[in-house]
Protein backbone atom coordinates (compact mmCIF):
# COMPACT_ATOMS: atom_id res chain seq x y z
CA UNK A 1 0.00 0.00 0.00
CA UNK A 2 1.15 3.55 -0.67
CA UNK A 3 0.23 7.19 -0.77
CA UNK A 4 -0.42 8.69 -4.23
CA UNK A 5 0.44 12.31 -4.92
CA UNK A 6 -0.11 14.51 -7.97
CA UNK A 7 1.89 17.72 -8.22
CA UNK A 8 0.81 20.31 -10.80
CA UNK A 9 -0.09 17.59 -13.29
CA UNK A 10 -1.06 18.86 -16.74
CA UNK A 11 -2.09 17.22 -19.99
CA UNK A 12 -1.79 19.13 -23.27
CA UNK A 13 -2.41 17.42 -26.60
CA UNK A 14 -0.28 18.12 -29.71
CA UNK A 15 -2.99 20.39 -31.15
CA UNK A 16 -2.71 22.60 -28.06
CA UNK A 17 -5.93 21.45 -26.41
CA UNK A 18 -5.57 21.18 -22.63
CA UNK A 19 -7.34 18.30 -20.89
CA UNK A 20 -5.90 18.59 -17.37
CA UNK A 21 -4.95 21.94 -15.80
CA UNK A 22 -2.33 21.76 -13.03
CA UNK A 23 -3.96 19.23 -10.69
CA UNK A 24 -2.59 18.97 -7.13
CA UNK A 25 -3.82 16.08 -5.01
CA UNK A 26 -2.68 13.79 -2.20
CA UNK A 27 -4.39 10.41 -1.68
CA UNK A 28 -3.63 8.82 1.67
CA UNK A 29 -2.44 5.26 2.13
CA UNK A 30 -5.50 2.97 2.19
CA UNK A 31 -7.93 5.71 1.10
CA UNK A 32 -10.62 5.24 -1.54
CA UNK A 33 -11.00 8.44 -3.50
CA UNK A 34 -13.56 8.89 -6.27
CA UNK A 35 -13.06 11.12 -9.31
CA UNK A 36 -16.55 12.24 -10.29
CA UNK A 37 -17.76 14.60 -12.96
CA UNK A 38 -19.66 14.78 -16.26
CA UNK A 39 -18.53 13.07 -19.44
CA UNK A 40 -15.48 14.76 -20.94
CA UNK A 41 -14.39 16.48 -17.72
CA UNK A 42 -10.97 14.74 -17.63
CA UNK A 43 -11.53 12.23 -14.84
CA UNK A 44 -10.62 9.15 -16.91
CA UNK A 45 -7.67 10.98 -18.45
CA UNK A 46 -6.36 11.70 -14.96
CA UNK A 47 -6.78 8.05 -13.95
CA UNK A 48 -4.99 6.87 -17.10
CA UNK A 49 -2.11 9.22 -16.32
CA UNK A 50 -1.72 7.54 -12.92
CA UNK A 51 -1.87 4.13 -14.64
CA UNK A 52 0.74 5.13 -17.23
CA UNK A 53 -1.66 4.70 -20.15
CA UNK A 54 -1.62 8.45 -20.86
CA UNK A 55 1.51 10.59 -20.93
CA UNK A 56 2.02 13.58 -18.63
CA UNK A 57 2.79 16.95 -20.22
CA UNK A 58 4.19 18.45 -17.01
CA UNK A 59 4.16 17.96 -13.26
CA UNK A 60 4.85 14.85 -11.21
CA UNK A 61 2.96 11.74 -10.09
CA UNK A 62 4.32 9.84 -7.09
CA UNK A 63 3.39 6.45 -5.68
CA UNK A 64 4.96 6.29 -2.26
CA UNK A 65 8.24 8.20 -2.56
CA UNK A 66 8.82 7.22 -6.20
CA UNK A 67 8.20 9.58 -9.12
CA UNK A 68 6.56 7.42 -11.79
CA UNK A 69 6.29 9.85 -14.74
CA UNK A 70 8.62 7.75 -16.89
CA UNK A 71 7.90 4.35 -15.33
CA UNK A 72 6.14 1.86 -17.63
CA UNK A 73 2.59 0.81 -16.67
CA UNK A 74 3.72 -2.72 -15.83
CA UNK A 75 6.31 -1.41 -13.37
CA UNK A 76 4.06 1.03 -11.49
CA UNK A 77 2.62 -1.65 -9.20
CA UNK A 78 -0.98 -0.66 -9.93
CA UNK A 79 -3.91 -2.85 -11.00
CA UNK A 80 -6.78 -1.58 -13.11
CA UNK A 81 -10.40 -2.73 -13.39
CA UNK A 82 -12.17 -1.58 -16.55
CA UNK A 83 -15.78 -1.01 -17.55
CA UNK A 84 -15.68 -3.77 -20.20
CA UNK A 85 -14.02 -6.42 -17.97
CA UNK A 86 -11.20 -6.98 -20.57
CA UNK A 87 -11.17 -10.75 -20.02
CA UNK A 88 -9.57 -13.19 -22.45
CA UNK A 89 -12.58 -15.07 -23.90
CA UNK A 90 -10.62 -18.25 -24.71
CA UNK A 91 -9.25 -18.61 -21.16
CA UNK A 92 -10.98 -19.97 -18.08
CA UNK A 93 -11.53 -17.82 -15.01
CA UNK A 94 -8.43 -19.40 -13.50
CA UNK A 95 -6.45 -18.65 -16.66
CA UNK A 96 -7.54 -15.01 -16.70
CA UNK A 97 -6.62 -14.54 -13.05
CA UNK A 98 -3.25 -16.27 -13.37
CA UNK A 99 -2.12 -14.80 -16.70
CA UNK A 100 -0.27 -11.76 -15.36
CA UNK A 101 1.36 -13.74 -12.55
CA UNK A 102 2.65 -16.37 -14.98
CA UNK A 103 4.19 -13.64 -17.10
CA UNK A 104 6.09 -12.56 -14.00
CA UNK A 105 7.44 -16.11 -13.62
CA UNK A 106 5.82 -16.43 -10.20
CA UNK A 107 5.97 -19.76 -8.39
CA UNK A 108 3.02 -22.03 -9.31
CA UNK A 109 2.08 -22.71 -5.71
CA UNK A 110 2.02 -18.98 -4.93
CA UNK A 111 -0.13 -18.34 -8.00
CA UNK A 112 -2.62 -21.00 -6.93
CA UNK A 113 -2.71 -19.67 -3.37
CA UNK A 114 -3.44 -16.13 -4.55
CA UNK A 115 -6.14 -17.30 -6.97
CA UNK A 116 -7.81 -19.42 -4.29
CA UNK A 117 -7.74 -16.57 -1.76
CA UNK A 118 -9.12 -13.99 -4.20
CA UNK A 119 -11.76 -16.33 -5.64
CA UNK A 120 -12.99 -17.25 -2.16
CA UNK A 121 -13.10 -13.59 -1.15
CA UNK A 122 -15.13 -12.70 -4.27
CA UNK A 123 -17.32 -15.85 -4.11
CA UNK A 124 -16.28 -17.04 -7.57
CA UNK A 125 -14.33 -20.12 -6.47
CA UNK A 126 -16.98 -22.40 -8.01
CA UNK A 127 -16.46 -20.72 -11.42
CA UNK A 128 -12.69 -21.10 -11.76
CA UNK A 129 -12.93 -23.61 -14.62
CA UNK A 130 -15.63 -21.76 -16.57
CA UNK A 131 -15.15 -19.52 -19.61
CA UNK A 132 -16.20 -15.83 -19.44
CA UNK A 133 -19.14 -16.45 -21.80
CA UNK A 134 -20.59 -18.85 -19.21
CA UNK A 135 -20.77 -16.09 -16.58
CA UNK A 136 -23.18 -13.25 -15.85
CA UNK A 137 -22.08 -9.62 -16.06
CA UNK A 138 -21.64 -9.40 -12.31
CA UNK A 139 -19.60 -12.60 -12.20
CA UNK A 140 -17.35 -11.35 -15.01
CA UNK A 141 -16.77 -8.12 -13.12
CA UNK A 142 -15.78 -10.14 -10.05
CA UNK A 143 -13.28 -12.05 -12.19
CA UNK A 144 -11.83 -8.75 -13.42
CA UNK A 145 -11.52 -7.62 -9.81
CA UNK A 146 -9.95 -10.95 -8.86
CA UNK A 147 -7.36 -10.56 -11.59
CA UNK A 148 -6.42 -7.21 -10.06
CA UNK A 149 -6.41 -8.54 -6.48
CA UNK A 150 -4.01 -11.43 -7.15
CA UNK A 151 -1.35 -8.95 -8.20
CA UNK A 152 -1.23 -7.51 -4.66
CA UNK A 153 -0.76 -3.99 -6.06
CA UNK A 154 0.03 -0.84 -4.14
CA UNK A 155 -2.88 0.96 -5.85
CA UNK A 156 -6.21 -0.15 -7.33
CA UNK A 157 -7.60 1.87 -10.26
CA UNK A 158 -11.29 1.49 -11.17
CA UNK A 159 -12.47 3.03 -14.46
CA UNK A 160 -16.30 3.08 -14.35
CA UNK A 161 -16.37 -0.67 -13.59
CA UNK A 162 -20.14 -0.88 -12.98
CA UNK A 163 -21.42 1.00 -16.04
CA UNK A 164 -22.37 -2.16 -17.94
CA UNK A 165 -24.40 -3.67 -15.09
CA UNK A 166 -28.12 -3.30 -14.40
CA UNK A 167 -29.32 -1.08 -11.55
CA UNK A 168 -29.80 -3.84 -8.98
CA UNK A 169 -26.42 -5.40 -9.70
CA UNK A 170 -24.69 -2.00 -9.56
CA UNK A 171 -25.94 -1.52 -6.01
CA UNK A 172 -24.78 -5.00 -5.01
CA UNK A 173 -21.36 -4.62 -6.65
CA UNK A 174 -20.59 -1.22 -5.18
CA UNK A 175 -21.27 -2.63 -1.69
CA UNK A 176 -18.90 -5.49 -2.46
CA UNK A 177 -16.22 -3.13 -3.78
CA UNK A 178 -16.43 -1.00 -0.63
CA UNK A 179 -16.22 -4.04 1.65
CA UNK A 180 -13.33 -5.46 -0.36
CA UNK A 181 -11.38 -2.21 -0.30
CA UNK A 182 -11.82 -1.88 3.46
CA UNK A 183 -10.74 -5.47 4.03
CA UNK A 184 -7.61 -5.13 1.88
CA UNK A 185 -6.88 -1.51 2.87
CA UNK A 186 -5.38 -0.75 -0.55
CA UNK A 187 -5.15 2.82 -1.82
CA UNK A 188 -7.83 3.09 -4.52
CA UNK A 189 -8.90 5.58 -7.18
CA UNK A 190 -12.37 5.12 -8.64
CA UNK A 191 -13.79 6.99 -11.64
CA UNK A 192 -17.51 7.44 -12.24
CA UNK A 193 -19.99 9.95 -13.65
CA UNK A 194 -22.69 8.57 -11.33
CA UNK A 195 -22.79 10.82 -8.27
CA UNK A 196 -24.86 8.33 -6.27
CA UNK A 197 -22.14 5.73 -6.82
CA UNK A 198 -19.54 8.33 -5.87
CA UNK A 199 -21.31 9.36 -2.66
CA UNK A 200 -21.78 5.80 -1.42
CA UNK A 201 -18.25 4.55 -2.19
CA UNK A 202 -15.87 7.39 -1.45
CA UNK A 203 -13.84 8.23 1.60
CA UNK A 204 -13.31 11.50 -0.28
CA UNK A 205 -14.63 12.88 -3.55
CA UNK A 206 -12.74 14.90 -6.13
CA UNK A 207 -15.32 16.73 -8.25
CA UNK A 208 -13.72 17.43 -11.63
CA UNK A 209 -14.95 19.99 -14.14
CA UNK A 210 -13.22 20.90 -17.40
CA UNK A 211 -9.90 19.39 -16.35
CA UNK A 212 -9.75 21.01 -12.93
CA UNK A 213 -10.69 19.97 -9.41
CA UNK A 214 -13.66 22.06 -8.31
CA UNK A 215 -13.64 20.69 -4.76
CA UNK A 216 -12.33 17.75 -2.71
CA UNK A 217 -13.72 16.42 0.54
CA UNK A 218 -15.88 13.83 2.26
CA UNK A 219 -19.17 13.12 0.44
CA UNK A 220 -21.43 14.81 3.00
CA UNK A 221 -19.04 17.75 3.28
CA UNK A 222 -19.49 18.44 -0.44
CA UNK A 223 -23.25 17.92 -0.21
CA UNK A 224 -23.67 20.22 2.80
CA UNK A 225 -20.94 22.73 2.03
CA UNK A 226 -20.42 23.03 -1.75
CA UNK A 227 -17.78 25.57 -2.74
CA UNK A 228 -19.24 26.34 -6.16
CA UNK A 229 -22.46 26.33 -8.14
CA UNK A 230 -21.15 23.39 -10.19
CA UNK A 231 -20.50 21.21 -7.13
CA UNK A 232 -23.91 22.07 -5.64
CA UNK A 233 -25.71 21.16 -8.87
CA UNK A 234 -23.71 17.99 -9.57
CA UNK A 235 -23.70 16.45 -6.08
CA UNK A 236 -27.05 15.39 -4.71
CA UNK A 237 -30.02 13.41 -6.02
CA UNK A 238 -32.52 14.74 -6.74
CA UNK A 239 -30.68 17.80 -7.98
CA UNK A 240 -30.63 21.00 -5.97
CA UNK A 241 -33.30 23.61 -6.82
CA UNK A 242 -31.60 26.66 -8.37
CA UNK A 243 -33.64 29.85 -8.53
CA UNK A 244 -32.32 33.05 -10.19
CA UNK A 245 -32.50 36.00 -7.79
CA UNK A 246 -31.21 39.54 -7.42
CA UNK A 247 -30.20 41.50 -4.31
CA UNK A 248 -32.00 44.82 -3.78
CA UNK A 249 -29.98 46.00 -0.80
CA UNK A 250 -31.95 44.23 1.92
CA UNK A 251 -33.41 41.05 0.40
CA UNK A 252 -33.02 38.58 -2.43
CA UNK A 253 -35.95 38.76 -4.82
CA UNK A 254 -37.55 37.03 -7.80
CA UNK A 255 -41.11 38.05 -8.60
CA UNK A 256 -43.25 37.24 -5.56
CA UNK A 257 -40.31 35.64 -3.71
CA UNK A 258 -38.60 37.94 -1.24
CA UNK A 259 -36.23 36.77 1.50
CA UNK A 260 -34.76 39.39 3.81
CA UNK A 261 -31.92 39.40 6.27
CA UNK A 262 -29.07 39.93 3.83
CA UNK A 263 -26.67 42.86 3.87
CA UNK A 264 -23.43 41.79 2.23
CA UNK A 265 -24.39 40.55 -1.24
CA UNK A 266 -23.40 42.36 -4.45
CA UNK A 267 -26.06 44.43 -6.22
CA UNK A 268 -26.47 44.42 -9.97
CA UNK A 269 -25.14 40.86 -10.21
CA UNK A 270 -27.08 37.77 -11.27
CA UNK A 271 -27.33 35.35 -8.34
CA UNK A 272 -28.67 31.83 -7.85
CA UNK A 273 -30.50 30.67 -4.74
CA UNK A 274 -29.82 26.97 -4.13
CA UNK A 275 -32.29 24.96 -2.03
CA UNK A 276 -31.99 21.20 -1.53
CA UNK A 277 -35.29 19.29 -2.00
CA UNK A 278 -34.96 17.82 1.49
CA UNK A 279 -34.91 21.21 3.26
CA UNK A 280 -38.24 22.34 1.76
CA UNK A 281 -41.33 21.64 3.88
CA UNK A 282 -45.06 22.22 3.56
CA UNK A 283 -46.19 25.14 5.73
CA UNK A 284 -49.38 27.25 5.44
CA UNK A 285 -47.21 30.29 6.22
CA UNK A 286 -44.46 29.35 3.73
CA UNK A 287 -42.70 31.75 1.36
CA UNK A 288 -43.98 30.32 -1.95
CA UNK A 289 -46.89 28.42 -3.50
CA UNK A 290 -46.12 25.28 -5.51
CA UNK A 291 -48.34 23.89 -8.28
CA UNK A 292 -47.90 20.11 -8.31
CA UNK A 293 -47.14 18.55 -11.69
CA UNK A 294 -45.78 15.05 -11.03
CA UNK A 295 -45.32 12.81 -7.99
CA UNK A 296 -42.68 10.07 -8.13
CA UNK A 297 -43.16 7.33 -5.55
CA UNK A 298 -39.91 5.74 -4.35
CA UNK A 299 -41.24 3.56 -1.55
CA UNK A 300 -39.80 5.20 1.56
CA UNK A 301 -40.09 8.71 0.11
CA UNK A 302 -41.88 10.66 -2.60
CA UNK A 303 -40.44 13.27 -4.96
CA UNK A 304 -42.87 16.02 -5.87
CA UNK A 305 -42.18 18.14 -8.96
CA UNK A 306 -43.95 21.35 -9.85
CA UNK A 307 -43.68 25.09 -10.46
CA UNK A 308 -43.79 28.10 -8.14
CA UNK A 309 -46.42 30.81 -8.56
CA UNK A 310 -44.98 34.23 -9.32
CA UNK A 311 -41.34 33.07 -9.44
CA UNK A 312 -39.57 32.77 -12.77
CA UNK A 313 -36.63 30.89 -14.27
CA UNK A 314 -33.92 32.59 -16.29
CA UNK A 315 -35.96 31.92 -19.45
CA UNK A 316 -39.01 33.69 -18.02
CA UNK A 317 -40.93 30.47 -17.46
CA UNK A 318 -42.44 29.53 -14.07
CA UNK A 319 -39.65 28.24 -11.82
CA UNK A 320 -39.56 24.45 -11.56
CA UNK A 321 -38.76 22.88 -8.18
CA UNK A 322 -38.56 19.48 -6.52
CA UNK A 323 -39.67 18.68 -2.97
CA UNK A 324 -38.65 15.50 -1.15
CA UNK A 325 -41.36 14.22 1.17
CA UNK A 326 -42.28 11.16 3.21
CA UNK A 327 -44.22 8.24 1.75
CA UNK A 328 -47.39 9.64 3.31
CA UNK A 329 -47.09 12.92 1.38
CA UNK A 330 -48.96 12.07 -1.81
CA UNK A 331 -50.62 15.11 -3.43
CA UNK A 332 -52.45 14.97 -6.75
CA UNK A 333 -51.39 16.77 -9.94
CA UNK A 334 -52.64 20.39 -9.95
CA UNK A 335 -52.77 20.49 -6.13
CA UNK A 336 -51.27 23.59 -4.53
CA UNK A 337 -48.77 23.34 -1.68
CA UNK A 338 -47.34 26.28 0.24
CA UNK A 339 -43.65 25.69 0.88
CA UNK A 340 -41.18 26.96 3.43
CA UNK A 341 -37.44 26.54 3.54
CA UNK A 342 -34.89 27.69 6.06
CA UNK A 343 -32.73 30.44 4.48
CA UNK A 344 -29.86 29.28 6.71
CA UNK A 345 -29.98 25.91 4.92
CA UNK A 346 -29.89 27.52 1.46
CA UNK A 347 -26.94 28.66 -0.65
CA UNK A 348 -26.37 31.77 -2.73
CA UNK A 349 -24.01 31.71 -5.73
CA UNK A 350 -22.79 34.19 -8.31
CA UNK A 351 -24.14 33.03 -11.66
CA UNK A 352 -21.18 34.31 -13.68
CA UNK A 353 -18.31 32.78 -11.66
CA UNK A 354 -20.13 30.03 -9.76
CA UNK A 355 -18.61 31.31 -6.51
CA UNK A 356 -20.62 30.60 -3.38
CA UNK A 357 -21.39 33.77 -1.44
CA UNK A 358 -23.47 32.29 1.40
From Swiss-Prot:
Catalytic activity: sn-glycerol 3-phosphate(out) + ATP + H2O = sn-glycerol 3-phosphate(in) + ADP + phosphate + H(+)
Subcellular location: Cell inner membrane
SMART domains (UniProt xref): AAA (SM00382)
Pfam families: ABC_tran
Gene Ontology MF terms in the entry: ABC-type glycerol-3-phosphate transporter activity; ATP binding; ATP hydrolysis activity
Record-annotated membrane-spanning stretches: none
Main localization of the protein described in the UniProt heading: membrane
InterPro entries in the record: AAA+_ATPase (IPR003593), ABC_transporter-like_ATP-bd (IPR003439), ABC_transporter-like_CS (IPR017871), ABC_transpr_MalK-like (IPR015855), ABC_transpr_MalK/UgpC-like (IPR047641), Mo/tungstate-bd_C_term_dom (IPR008995), NA-bd_OB-fold (IPR012340), P-loop_NTPase (IPR027417)
GO cellular component term, pick one: ATP-binding cassette (ABC) transporter complex, substrate-binding subunit-containing
ABC transporter domain location: 4-235
E.C. number: 7.6.2.10
Residues annotated for ATP binding in this entry: 37-44
Keywords from the named record: ATP-binding, Cell inner membrane, Cell membrane, Membrane, Nucleotide-binding, Sugar transport, Translocase, Transport
GO biological process, any: carbohydrate transport
Membrane topology term: Peripheral membrane protein
The protein's role, per its UniProt record: Part of the ABC transporter complex UgpBAEC involved in sn-glycerol-3-phosphate (G3P) import. Responsible for energy coupling to the transport system.
Family the UniProt entry places it in: Belongs to the ABC transporter superfamily. sn-glycerol-3-phosphate importer (TC 3.A.1.1.3) family.
Subunit structure: The complex is composed of two ATP-binding proteins (UgpC), two transmembrane proteins (UgpA and UgpE) and a solute-binding protein (UgpB).
Protein name per its UniProtKB record: sn-glycerol-3-phosphate import ATP-binding protein UgpC
Source organism per UniProt: Roseobacter denitrificans (strain ATCC 33942 / OCh 114) (Erythrobacter sp. (strain OCh 114))
Amino acid sequence: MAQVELKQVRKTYPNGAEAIFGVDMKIDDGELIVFVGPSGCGKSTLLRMVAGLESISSGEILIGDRVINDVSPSERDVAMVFQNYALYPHMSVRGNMSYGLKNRKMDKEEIERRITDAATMLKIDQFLDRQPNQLSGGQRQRVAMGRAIVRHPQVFLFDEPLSNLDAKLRVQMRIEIKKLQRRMNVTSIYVTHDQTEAMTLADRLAVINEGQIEQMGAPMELYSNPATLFVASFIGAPQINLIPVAFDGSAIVNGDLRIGGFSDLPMGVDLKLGVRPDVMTIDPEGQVMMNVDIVEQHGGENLIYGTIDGVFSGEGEPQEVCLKGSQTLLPNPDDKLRLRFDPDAAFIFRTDTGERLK
